[in-house]
């Protein structure tokens, strides 16, 4: 699809402004009195030389103040009475003044309103990582994508040097996105590591629930937005992992720069990472597990089912509290609640009811039909039950099958902080 190019010449124009001829000695006083009524325009001064007098300056008023009774002293019905009185008292002449404008004098909003047809949304929100701005333009804006990119580069700089647009879905194993360059330098270091800056408040919210004695496992740690602050600020012991070697590289750098000294970093598949921790001698008794890969996190819960709901493999450590991020489609909630549906999706993976004190939190709208959710729960476990019947009881029991119950496992007995249930804590 071809894209229209930006023509900056259409913004070259002359506008007529109300000007006040003011003695230089009165400039400071007038500027204070007329605050809120002066010209505000990018790269245009509101005080200019008066071509008719070296002793005076021309003070330019807001574009909303129309020309009125030019040549008179202090007559303009759009000014409040006190300012009109000021003009009369000091015999200040009202004149017309022509101001030449070009593309540089217009704001981002003004340029976009001129370029984008009425009825189409003006793009305001975009992610920024370093010098790179990246957008996710809607289909109806694609014919204007290059113009939009150039305007962002011109009006949101100089810190922005590259503007990208996401193309297609995020479907790579490392959760990076396909993109196209809209404007600026082809300097794309951020293409190999992606951090979603919109979630910085969510990172803080979760980390604040941790205590210094917690042992935290971050299965999809990325560059460390959870792991590094948990180590540096809360002083937790953190085991952080990511499959993407580039993410691991920059996570190590972030940990070093921030003096986060309690992090152990791995570059493994998430399931293998957890298995390795619990297979150590002694096993790592982690208390918190973070799973921040919303598109597939929920599928990786099976590793906790494998470890804590399998009595043959269960390590001698308490079950952790799990914080799992997931996308919940709104369309699937017909006849149900977003939070209830999230709980059902998790229970389908671990094949066990969740505790009653499970909490589900809506993090943000991803799209009109999708929500990002965080579900936090204590991982259920199974408890071995030993029969304590004495020999006399066994002899009096005519059912011989009871003799085989010693040291067997009751698969129906769940041990968890809140018992079985689906109650949601809001």
Swiss-Prot record:
Give the protein's recorded name. tRNA (guanine(37)-N(1))-methyltransferase
Any one GO molecular-function label of the UniProt entry: tRNA (guanine(37)-N1)-methyltransferase activity
User: Which top EC class is given?
Assistant: transferase
Catalytic activities:
guanosine(37) in tRNA + S-adenosyl-L-methionine = N(1)-methylguanosine(37) in tRNA + S-adenosyl-L-homocysteine + H(+)
- Please list where the region (Disordered) is annotated: 374-426
Q: Binding residues for S-adenosyl-L-methionine, per the UniProt record?
A: 203, 242-243, 269-270, 292
Function description: Specifically methylates the N1 position of guanosine-37 in various cytoplasmic and mitochondrial tRNAs. Methylation is not dependent on the nature of the nucleoside 5' of the target nucleoside. This is the first step in the biosynthesis of wybutosine (yW), a modified base adjacent to the anticodon of tRNAs and required for accurate decoding.
Q: Name one GO biological process term.
A: mitochondrial tRNA methylation
Q: Which domain of life is it from?
A: Eukaryota
The record's EC number reads 2.1.1.228
């Amino acid at each position: 699809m071809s894209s229209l190019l930006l023509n900056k010449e259409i913004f070259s124009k002359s506008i007529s402004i109300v000007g006040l001829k003011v003695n230089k000695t009165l400039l400071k006083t007038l500027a204070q009195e007329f605050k809120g009524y002066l010209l505000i325009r990018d790269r245009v001064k509101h005080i200019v030389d008066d071509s008719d007098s070296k002793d005076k300056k021309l003070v330019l008023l807001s574009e909303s103040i129309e020309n009125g009774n030019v040549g008179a002293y202090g007559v303009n019905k759009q000014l409040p009475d006190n300012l009109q009185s000021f003009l009369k008292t000091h015999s200040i002449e009202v004149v017309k003044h022509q101001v030449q404008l070009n593309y540089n004098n217009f704001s981002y909003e003004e340029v976009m309103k001129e370029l984008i047809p009425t009825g189409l949304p003006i793009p305001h929100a975009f992610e920024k990582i370093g010098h790179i701005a990246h957008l996710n333009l809607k289909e109806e804006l694609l014919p204007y994508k290059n113009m939009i990119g150039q305007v962002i580069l011109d009006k949101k700089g100089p810190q922005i040097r590259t503007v990208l647009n996401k193309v297609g879905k995020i479907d790579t194993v490392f959760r990076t996105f396909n993109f196209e360059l809209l404007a600026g330098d082809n300097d794309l270091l951020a293409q190999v590591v992606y951090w979603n800056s919109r979630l910085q408040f969510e990172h803080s919210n979760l980390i604040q629930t941790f205590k210094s004695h917690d042992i935290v496992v971050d299965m999809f740690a990325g560059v460390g937005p959870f792991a590094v602050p948990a180590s540096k600020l809360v002083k937790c012991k953190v085991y952080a992992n990511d499959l993407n070697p580039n993410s691991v590289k920059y996570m190590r750098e972030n940990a070093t720069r921030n003096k986060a000294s309690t992090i152990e970093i791995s570059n493994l598949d998430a399931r293998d990472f957890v298995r390795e921790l619990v297979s150590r001698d002694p096993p790592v008794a982690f208390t918190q597990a973070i799973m921040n890969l919303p598109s597939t996190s929920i599928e990786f819960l099976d590793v906790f089912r494998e470890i804590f709901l399998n009595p043959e493999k269960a390590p001698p450590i308490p079950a952790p509290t799990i914080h799992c991020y997931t996308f919940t489609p709104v369309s699937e909630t017909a006849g149900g609640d977003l939070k209830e549906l999230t709980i059902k999706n998790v229970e389908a993976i671990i094949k066990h009811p969740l505790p009653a004190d499970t909490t589900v939190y809506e993090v943000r709208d991803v799209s009109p039909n999708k929500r990002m959710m965080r579900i936090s729960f204590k991982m259920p476990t199974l408890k071995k039950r030993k029969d304590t019947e004495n020999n006399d009881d066994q002899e009096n029991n005519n059912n011989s099958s009871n003799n085989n119950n010693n040291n067997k496992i009751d698969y129906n007995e769940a041990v968890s902080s809140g018992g079985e249930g689906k109650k949601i804590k809001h």
